[in-house]
Structure formats: C-alpha cells, structure tokens
Design a protein with these regions (language model features):
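Glycine- and acidic-rich phosphate- and metal-coordinating loops
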Residues: 133-156
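Beta-strand segments within the central parallel beta-sheet cores of soluble alpha/beta enzyme folds
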Residues: 99-101, 145-152, 182-194, 332-337
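C-terminal nucleotide
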Residues: 1-62, 87, 91-122, 219-378, ...
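Phosphate-handling active-site elements
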Residues: 138-146, 174-188, 394-399
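Alpha/beta catalytic cores of group-transfer enzymes, especially the acyltransferase/condensing modules
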Residues: 180-229, 338, 364-367, 379
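DPxDG-like acidic metal-binding loop motif
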Residues: 81-83, 160-180, 392
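Structural signature of FAD isoalloxazine-binding scaffolds in flavoprotein oxidoreductases
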Residues: 76-94, 214
Length: 399
C-alpha cells in the first residue's frame, strides 16, 4: 500500500507496466496510461488527501460479439472485454460512507448503514453504489466505507456498457478493500446485475456485467442464470489481419430504457404462450408450428423478436466453433447474419419513438458500402443508438 506520491512514483517508474500491458496491449497505450493514472491520483490528493493509503482499480467495458439480446431470455452470448475501461484510485475509510467522485460529475455519497432502495436514485449512479453494497451483503460478503475518484473511457450511451463497467469497478473495490479479493468474477457480475435491476431499475440481462467482470473473449450460457457456464474462447485475434472497431454514431442510449425493456417483455410474452417464462425453455419447432396463433395473441413484432432469439442463440455456437478452428472468414459471415437478424427481426437499430433519428442505420449502411466482401459489421449491445461494431481488414483500416 502506498500514499499518493508513492503511487505516482511507482506508475512513472514502470512498476505497473506489466499489469498495464495485460489490459492495454501496446507499448504506446501503456505509456498513455501513465499520465491517465497519475492524473487520477492527483485528483484523489486534491479532493481527499495525499497522505492516505491508496490503490488502483480498473474494470473494462465490453463488446457483445454474438447473441444480441439473448442473455435476458437465458440464451448464449459471445462477448469480450475491451481496453476502454473505468479506473479508480481508492482508499478505505471507517465512516460507513462511500464517496465516489467521477471526473466531470458531482460526488456520489452513500451511507451504507441504509441500503434501502431509494426511488429518487433510480436511474442514477448512487443507486448502483447502494445496490452493489446491498448485493455484497446479500451474498454474504463484507462491505465498508471508502473514498474513490474515477474516470472512464467507456463513454455513457456508447453501447459499451458504461453502467456495467461502473458496477464492476465498485464491486472490485469492495472485493479488494474489504474481502481480500475472495469474491470471484462471476459473483461480482451477478451482484452488478442485481444492483442494476433492483436499485437502478433497468431490466438488463447478465451478459454486460459478466463480460466486464470476467474479461477477455468469453462465451457464456445463461440456461441456468444462477450458475452461468463461462468458457474462455482462445483465438489469436492478431493473426486474423483485422481490427475490431467500435464506431460511435453519436446517438445516446440515455432515453431508451422503454425500448430495451420491450424486447425482453415481448420475447417473454411469446414464451408465456407456451407456459414458459423465457424463450430458452420453448421448443423452437413448436413455436414455428404455432406462429399464426402466437401472432394473434402477442403481435407480429414479438414473433419476429422470438425468431431472432432462436437464430442468434444457435449462431453463437457456430461463431465459437469458427474461432476455435481459426476460420475467421466463416466467423465474419456469422457476424453479418447476426447483424441482419438484429436489423430485420429484433428491430433494435432505431427507436420507433424517433424514426427520423437513425444514426445506427446510417452507420450500418455506410459500413456495407465500405466493407462489403472484405469485413463484417453489425449493431451490438442494446442497440437503438450509440455504437456499431465492425471487423475491418488492417490493410484498409487507415482509409
């Protein structure tokens, strides 16, 4: 443990470079992190104290690579942590107060002796702090007060799961400040989903939190959501000759909770036609044989979204197999199929509330013009706004 000056000296002296390299990959990126972390340490000294013992923390954003909107209906996903992350400099306190000052935002202050759900906090970051603390206790772990400064390169509303990265960051601080690092990544993800569902009041699945918490390239099967099956997918992406690009369309996710919730509720409305709670429990052949009756009961869009679920859920297995076989061209074809399904069937490329605003649609159209026959592109994550995902051949990346 070190005070702020000792921490800064260690960062600038290269003592963290091996750990930075695991997260940020290139030497150039590692050097850029020196000033980023030192700047955050200076923030801590200015806001709290330069003399307290402090520690560094990081939680990545995520990109969903396969299985678009399948997790909340207990499906499969293929996801990856990315090197855009939320970071923190933090120190324990003995006040039972959590203070988190995120750069550019006002300080969140949470009295953790009161972990009741607060209606006025729903949709705001204090709810995530309170929810993470409540979740740690619910799972039998320790909590305590701490002071932290944070900053994030995972832009809010970008489709890279800024809220999940923030939740996992708070969970990681609680884990190492009060639980000696004994809380595993899967449990932190479950607690993060609990915080977002119950305290933040957003009905998300578990994929975002799991990818942010576990990191790397992972496939996750949520058939039993209390015990999701997480498997690493080993693939040398550098050998593919492509770069994974996340393209910001400048649209925001901040106004779209109802659109996201409708996807889950409509999929579940189809499941209810078969006496089930989620689509993973429904037999696909039975569903297809009864489409006329189902569409009369729950509507055409719900049927289309169910069709997307079944196809994209099965497609994840094909994507994983292609990667493990080193067949990147086949993998790209599945990426294109997934994007087409999201656009036509899941219909999460633009909001029907704002039909004149279609930045994701435009970005996908331009990507097709530029990358057809060369790369792959798709909407990812929640959709409707934010970012798209593109696999771009390195030889045309600069163009």
């Amino acid at each position: 443990m070190a005070n702020v000056q000792m921490l800064k000296d260690a960062i600038l002296g290269g003592e963290y470079d091996l750990r930075f390299k695991r997260v940020y990959v290139t030497e150039e990126a590692v050097k850029a992190q020196h000033q980023r972390y030192v700047g955050l340490a200076n923030d801590f000294a200015e806001i709290f104290s330069a003399d307290r013992e402090v520690r560094l923390f990081s939680a990545p954003g995520r990109t969903e690579v396969g299985g678009n909107h399948t997790d909340h209906n207990h499906g499969r996903v293929l996801a990856a942590g990315i090197n855009l992350d939320a970071i923190a400099v933090a120190s324990k306190n003995d006040e039972n107060i959590v203070r988190v000052k995120s750069r550019g935002y006002k300080m969140d202050v949470c009295d953790i002796t009161d972990l009741e759900i607060k209606e006025d906090e729903k949709g705001h970051s204090p709810a995530l702090v309170r929810g993470m603390c409540a979740g740690f206790l619910k799972y039998g772990y320790k909590i305590g007060g701490f002071d932290a400064v944070t900053m994030s390169s995972v832009l809010s509303g970008s489709g890279l799961s800024s809220s999940a990265a923030y939740e996992v960051l708070v969970g990681t601080m609680l884990n190492y400040l009060y639980n000696d690092g004994q809380v595993d990544a899967v449990t932190i993800a479950k607690i993060a989903q609990y915080a977002e569902n119950v305290y933040f009041d957003k009905p998300c699945g578990l994929m975002d939190q799991m990818a942010c918490s576990v990191g790397g390239f992972v496939t996750i099967d949520f058939n039993n959501p209390s015990e999701p099956v997480v498997e690493e997918v080993k693939f040398d992406f550098a050998s593919s000759g492509h770069s994974l690009c996340i393209v910001d369309t400048k649209g925001s996710h901040s106004d779209l909770t109802d659109d996201y919730a409708a996807i889950r509720s409509e999929m579940e409305s189809v499941a209810s036609c078969f006496g089930k709670s989620v689509l993973r429990e429904v037999d696909e052949e039975e569903f297809r044989s009864k489409i006329p009756a189902v569409r009369k009961k729950v509507g055409d869009r719900a049927v289309l979204r169910a069709m997307h679920f079944f196809a994209d859920n099965a497609r994840v297995l094909k994507e994983v197999e292609a990667l493990r076989n080193g067949d990147f061209e086949t993998f790209k074809s599945y990426i294109l199929e997934s994007g087409d399904s999201s656009y036509k069937y899941n219909q999460n490329v633009f909001s029907v509330k704002k039909p004149l605003e279609q930045p994701v649609s435009l970005a996908l159209a331009l990507s097709e013009e530029l990358l057809k026959g060369k790369g792959a592109w798709r909407v990812h994550g929640g959709g409707f706004a934010g970012t798209i995902q593109a696999f771009v051949p390195n030889d045309i990346l600069a163009d």
